[in-house]
Structure formats: C-alpha cells, structure tokens
Amino acid sequence: MSKKPVVLMILDGFGLTNKVDGNAVSAANKPNLDNILKKYPHTQLGASGMDVGLPEGQMGNSEVGHLNIGAGRIVYQALTKITKSISDGDFFENVALNKAIENVKKNNSTLHLLGLLSPGGVHSHIDHLKGLIKLAKEKDIKKVYIHAFLDGRDVAPSSAKEYIEDIENYMNEIGVGEIATISGRYYAMDRDKRWERVQLCYNAIVLGKGEEANSAVEGLEKSYRDNKTDEFVLPSVVLKEGKPKAKIENKDSVVFFNFRPDRARELTRAINDKVFDGFERETLDLTYVTVTEYDSTLENVEVAFPPEHLNNTLGEYVSKNGKKQLRIAETEKYAHVTFFFNGGVEEPNEGEDRVLIPSPKVATYDMQPEMNAYEVTDKLLERLDEDKYDMVILNFANPDMVGHTGVFEAAKKAIETVDECVGKIVNKVLEKDGTAFITADHGNSEEMIDYSTGKPMTAHTTNPVPFMYVSKNSKELREGGKLADIAPTMLQLMNLPKPSEMTGNSLIK
C-alpha cells in the first residue's frame, strides 16, 4: 500500500516582496509555482528578526531557518544570546573566555581574535569582537591581534573599509588591539574542503606569509584595485617595520568569534587539530576557544557558549512515533536539512535516511545556476516510489546560493530550475495521495538590488517567505505565521499530537 507522504520542500533564499526591480523570483518564468498559488491555499511566514529568535530587523539565514522549522518553536540564536550576555556583563566572567585570558597572562603570550568583521549577524557580529577587546582591556592584556575576515556577502560587497575603520577607532579609543591580517571569507571560511583556499588564510595568520600591506585599509584598497571585492580579498599580512605584526605561535590563545559553525570548522581544524590531513603544517600548542560549538568531534577546544539541547524536534518526535523519514539536499545545504534541522544533533534519528548529492565544483554558482537540483529531484522521485517514507525534508539550494552571486539572470535561471523540479515532485506526491508543503528558510533572490544605492545586493533579506499547502483536500491557512509553525502543521497532517516542547501552532485554520 502506498504511504501518503508529507513532503516539505524548502526553497532556500526564496522570499516575497512586492517590489519588481531586482526581484528574480517575480521575473522568473515559473508556471508550476504560479499554478500552485492559483489553485492551493498559501500564506506568508515571518523568517527574520524576533520571529526566528534574532534581534529585531535582523535578516534570517539558513542555519536559523532550519533550526526554527525543525524545532517547531522559536530558537533564540547565538547572536541574540551573546549580545545579551555582553549587555548583562556575564560575558566578561565567561569561563572559556577567561581560560584564554589566563593562558596569555601565564605565558606572557598573545591573544588572537579571529572572525568575520561584519555587522551582518549571520556568522558573527562586530559588537561581539568589541566585547572581546573590552574583556582583554579589563583583564590588562597587552598583546591583542585581530585576524579580520572580510564579508561582502551578508553585507554590501565592498563595505569592509567602514568596519575596519570602526574597529580600529574602537581599539584606539580603548587602548588595546591591532589588526594583524585580513582575508576574504572565500579563503578563511570555506566549508567545502577546498583546502587550497584555507591554506592561504592559514599561511597569513600562522606563518605571516601572503600579500603584504602596511595597514589593513591599504591591503583592502590594493585588492579593490585588482577588482577583488571584500569576499575575495587575498589573505594579507599587515607589516610593522617590514615584519608581520603578529603570527599565531605556541602558547598563544585564540578566540574564534564566529558563532555560526559551518564556515568556521575548517580553519579551526587547520590551526588546532593534532592530526590534520588537509595540507602539511606544524602542530601548535594553543588555548583555543570557539564562541559556540563548531563540531562535537573537535579536540582541545573550549566552547564559550555551549549548545542547549532541543528535545522533541520534528525529526526526533516523528521517529519516536515509529515513522520513517528522508532528508535530501546537495552539499551546500546538506548540513541544514540534517544537523540544523535536528536541533544541532549530528546523529540521524531512528528511521531517518539521508541522501547527499554533491554540489557542482564551480568557482561561483552563477556559472551553473541549476546546481544539482535535477539530480536531487530524480533521486527523490526514486525514493518516493519506494513507498517507505512518512515524511520527507528537501532543500533546493539554488535561489540562495545563486542569489549570493548578485548575478540577476543566473538567479532567474536558478528559480526556473527549481520551479521545474517542484512541478515534478508535486505531481508525484499527489499521485501518492500525499501532501506537499512548499516554503523557504529566508529571503535572498527576491531582492538583488540595494534600493538605496542601486548596486547589486548579495545578502539575505528580512522579507517574509511563502508557505503553500498542496494536497487533494487542502484546507485554508491562517495569516501571521512564522517558521516555527511549520512542524506543528506537518504533525497535524500526520495525525500526531504536538509535543509540549513545540510552542509553534498549526497554520491550518
């Protein structure tokens, strides 16, 4: 007998806005989604700010979106938690951070602060770096060096100068800290095992080798002259009297202040793992602190803000009730439909199968806007024909990953690809008498122009996202929902009572 699967399709970075300029979502030819909107109930969901546990006005992102969807409750994010701890003063008493401080005092060594220098709030926040500099000042640490990773992706592509000057002014004011290296996030924050990129960043911060400049701004301006925006700035060493200002050396302390794990793991492993095979390098004896847990298998790492365990996430609860589930995505979003969707738990639930389709190896995804969506779709259709699964969670990476390139025509093509795939999947789900829910984790490709400057916008947005309910007997949906309401809606369709931990509410009227 055919199971009636409940399928959740997350179209990553597919937001909604009435504005037409720079809107790849509205410009794309998408007959399947247009038809679904005509025929089936749909609503809009909040996917940013307080709706997902972020500060008001803060754009959503994939990690946060999948956490909230999978948890069925608002999950207060590391950004909100750390900012609050700085304003409450608890931050300055943090045990892990103070271990880094004590090590520097004991060995008369150096404190290195690594992370994305940006107010973007997706991977890091510049205010958290200021908190760390203030902590160093309060504890009377003299040798404090910043290894600044430049953004240009969650903020405007060429905005780094503003943030470099902001942090330099803060350090001058407070009387401690200097920038030792700068590096585009393309090198410092890879997540696809492109070790040749990570190695260039490692060489700058550990060996003092790379592009050279007499100041961070000089290094940045040199990069701009070579037509490289912030994200792609080659790892550069800031010199003092012809020598690198600082390198990470034995007995030093390192604090990596990115709070989002996925793009901080590789560099952490390169610097701190005792056994490492990404490239040849010496092992260092460091006190290494990460503000959040990047990976539970990392050794010799202190975690300043350890994860809080989320009980009864959608996947866990469905599993406890004896149901079978499938998670499927390509590499770029695989962690999102597994680790993040499961509340930061790496282990699959019982009865949870996973399918990973490798993302194409291209320099930037505007070169292949369809990415591997067709392969994901074909594999899913095969799996649906096995009639094994009660629930399927699927992510299409295209609207987000191609939206990040800022190339409008490519983003349009990305949406058109996804539309084609959605059409095939919806037909199969209806054939099985199942239900398809179509949503997104945050916006991106619906707003590819910065309306204030007219320049390309590569960041996420604060726009709402769609929620479409496709089945042979769809019911009306209520307004005013948020991502946390999706899991309770799916449980209702699966005839499972909502667990007490889920504070979201079903979207079905």
UniProtKB/Swiss-Prot annotation:
Substrate binds at H123, R153, D154, R185, R191, R260, P261, D262, R263, K333. The gene is gpmI. GO terms for cellular component: cytosol. One of its GO terms (molecular function) is phosphoglycerate mutase activity. This is 2,3-bisphosphoglycerate-independent phosphoglycerate mutase. It catalyses: (2R)-2-phosphoglycerate = (2R)-3-phosphoglycerate. Catalyzes the interconversion of 2-phosphoglycerate and 3-phosphoglycerate. Binds 2 manganese ions per subunit. InterPro entries: Alkaline_phosphatase_core_sf (IPR017850), BPG-indep_PGM_N (IPR011258), Metalloenzyme (IPR006124), PGAM_B_sf (IPR036646), Pgm_bpd_ind (IPR005995). The keyword Manganese applies. It comes from Clostridium botulinum (strain ATCC 19397 / Type A). Its EC number is 5.4.2.12. Its cofactor is Mn(2+).
